[in-house]
Amino acid sequence: MPAIVTNKFRIHNAKQFVEAFDEVSFTAGAAITDASGLLNTNMYLFIGKVTPWADDTAPPTPTDSVSNTVYNHWRDMIAAKKIGSTDVSQVIPRYNWTSGSNYFAYNNANNALFDQQFYVMTDDYNVYKCLANNNSGGTSTNKPSGTGTSIVTTADKYKWKFMYQVSASRALKFVTPSYIPTQRVRKSNDTIAETTDSSFQYDVEIAANTSGNGAVEIVHVSTAGSGYTFEVGTVQAGHTETTTSAKITGGSGITGGIVDNDIYFTSDSGSGVTGKGGTITGYVAGTQVVTWTPALASSNVPEDGAGYSIGPKVAITGDGHGANVRSTNTATGTIGDIVVVAGGNNYGNAVATISTTVGTGGVLTPIIGPRGGHGDDAIEELGGFFVMVNSRLEYGESGNFTTNNDFRKIGLVAQPLYANGDVATASTIDQCVTITVQSWNSTAFAEDELVTGSASAATGKVVDFKNNTTLRLVDVTQGSNTTVGYDSIAGSFQANETFTGAGGASANTSAVVGGDFEKFSGDILYIENRSPVTRADDQIEDVKLIIEF
């Protein structure tokens, strides 16, 4: 049967992954007082693979077999660093606003929306959603600006909704040439969940909620038509204005042809009539008195000098209620734009109908906003089904991350345990087998060199030989000796045996210690094979991993 996994499912999974980093941790020996305590994601980023690929310039694509995912990545793991909640964010593809570019407009009926450039980030790190693009996908030449909650209309007739501003701290961690961070700062109780972006986004989210669900906030002019009557002017003295009548002037072409058009008041001096109006029922040319229905509230009688606009009546019908719009023009007789007076609510489908005795050919498309209104949830609205994990590997990280050798593999492991079975909590982890050297023959062990234990016959590859006293190995394999070694397993390295390198180095040892993690514990969730990354004592690696859900 036909079926679909929706984008909501992908976004939900991405949200759950990020939110898991803030959940309560359960550690061995602690009383379980809340089921949520078991949901914590204890995540580490690890590096591995000191030995070359078959072609270091073209690393192989990782495979998700049991051998690789469960076992092999543990064998060449060098070190790991804990990932915190501030190291993870949902992200979206980066589209920089550029003058001369064309941008798609948001459309509730577009099932390919998230594959299109319908939002931008400006050079001041403001993110805007495109709601209208000059009715025809016209070129954008005016950069959107401002951090307010109202829709921004630029001179090129694009309409933009400010969504949020990327803070400096989040830009440093999560902005790349290809991605930018997104988030929702408001919790369900309207408190701020994230404080890193201050109140700009919070204000946008709160204001969006006033629109409600299924509001018509934009109406696209698909075809402008011709022959329509438009007039603007002011209410004149010489007539006692009522809730259904006023004397008007300002347009030499006003005739009885304006009947059945709409009149909306665009300004007032205190009557509160701005944005209100009705459908014209009559016009007397001699007195210039226009009448309309339905009647305004008694407190909103238009006063002398109030501005008005007359245009073809546009009705929004559908499965919702309350949408109220008016038309304006930019050229003689054509519909230039639709001003939304009230968006209504609960529309899932809507149709715009032009009702007038003068003019033909206009086609309008109501655009229904997302749940909660534009700006309520940037993650949902902009397609945040990507997650970025950022970790800075600073110098040697207390000696756990080698600065003498390179690495070719980066991964994420969740819920690893210490070698004693406890939940791992340290900020950095050394996963090498570490051998304490008692004496050696003055020939240094070289990076990547194969080392063999004389008694155990176990082997390993050299990560580094630090201070001529500590030898660290990965890719360790057990030998044929039946004597148990440092980890109580037969064939493992033994303390006090001689280690010999393939290049002639030899050392007597006093102790062997395994990696901090219990090997094969936890789940490896992500692997990325890379060309060799060379490290140095004064070097910082800013690692950014992108996971698509």
State each model region's role.
Residues D156-F549:
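Conserved, function-critical positions that sit in or immediately flank catalytic
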Residues K143-S145:
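Short, solvent-exposed beta-strand-to-loop segments that form ligand-recognition rims
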Residues M1-G138, T147-N189, T402-V437, S442-G453, ...:
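Extended assembly-interface regions of large multimeric machines
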